[in-house]
Design a protein with these regions (language model features):
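Helix-to-loop junction immediately C-terminal to a conserved catalytic motif
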Residues: 47
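Catalytic Walker B motif of ABC-type/P-loop ATPase nucleotide-binding domains
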Residues: 152-160
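Conserved ABC ATPase signature
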Residues: 127-131, 135
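Short coil-to-helix segment of the ABC ATPase nucleotide-binding domain corresponding to the Q-loop/switch region
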Residues: 87-96
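ABC ATPase nucleotide-binding domain "signature" region
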Residues: 30, 139-148
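Conserved ABC ATPase "signature" region
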Residues: 63, 105-123, 178-179
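ABC ATPase NBD coupling module
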Residues: 63-76, 80
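Helix N-cap at the start of a conserved alpha-helix in ABC-type nucleotide-binding domains
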Residues: 167-169
Length: 213
């Protein structure tokens, strides 16, 4: 379970975000809401990119607000993808594990498997600037999945992970996530504008409304 209790964050212009909720995470969660409703703010608080002024954020009996972002059990996919354009797609995924050390043989096998499952094996040695937006999105998703598999960072925060994907590719990505939830215990929270996603994922839908004051 992921529990947010009386989380408050004040924006620079004075408006503040206030939110309490218990996510059981037994199935994926899809967060939806109008533009500006606080969806990205919520993910950024969980990820530790912004700090609330009050409240607590509890996951597996730990208050994540007392844990540095790098130590939290998270695998994050940002809406922009956050890929480094000057290094290969493969290296973009590898640095999700370790910025400096070598990747071991087991990790290499997992990375290869994830690339194959996402249909991006042909793009391992090219730069992100040389592939399409949908392919870039799959590289970013691969990095999140590899972190979950190799580092045990199984709370996955995915911001619009299916943007730019055709229906067939999207279905493959969804099936891979569902399989990970069932077999490996991923806990998945997705921000999505697509009203079909909760049904496709078999997910609980949480709509953000009236949480900005």
């Amino acid at each position: 379970m992921l529990e947010l209790s009386d989380i408050k964050f004040r924006y620079p212009k004075g408006e503040y975000f206030q939110f309490s909720y218990k996510f059981d995470l037994l199935t994926p969660v899809v967060i939806q809401g109008a533009s500006g409703s606080g969806k990205s703010t919520l993910l950024n608080i969980i990820a530790g990119l912004i700090s609330p002024s009050s409240g607590y954020l509890r996951f597996e009996d730990k208050n994540l607000l007392k844990i540095s972002p790098s130590e939290r059990p998270l695998s994050v996919l940002f809406q922009s993808g956050n890929l480094f354009d000057h290094i290969s797609c493969l290296r973009n995924v590898e640095i999700g594990l370790n910025m400096r050390s070598r990747i071991n043989s087991e990790e290499k096998f997992i990375i290869e498997e994830v690339f194959q499952n996402l249909g991006i094996s042909d793009h391992k040695n090219v730069l992100p600037t040389e592939i399409s937006g949908g392919q870039r999105k799959r590289i970013a998703l691969a990095r999140a999945i590899v972190r979950a598999k190799c580092l045990g960072k199984k709370l996955m925060l995915l911001d619009e992970p299916f943007n730019g994907l055709d229906f067939e590719t999207k279905s493959e990505c969804i099936n891979l996530l569902k399989d990970g939830c069932f077999k490996e215990g991923y806990k998945v929270i997705i921000v999505s504008h697509d009203n079909n996603d909760p049904t496709l994922l078999g997910a609980n839908r949480v709509k953000l409304e009236n949480i900005l004051r």
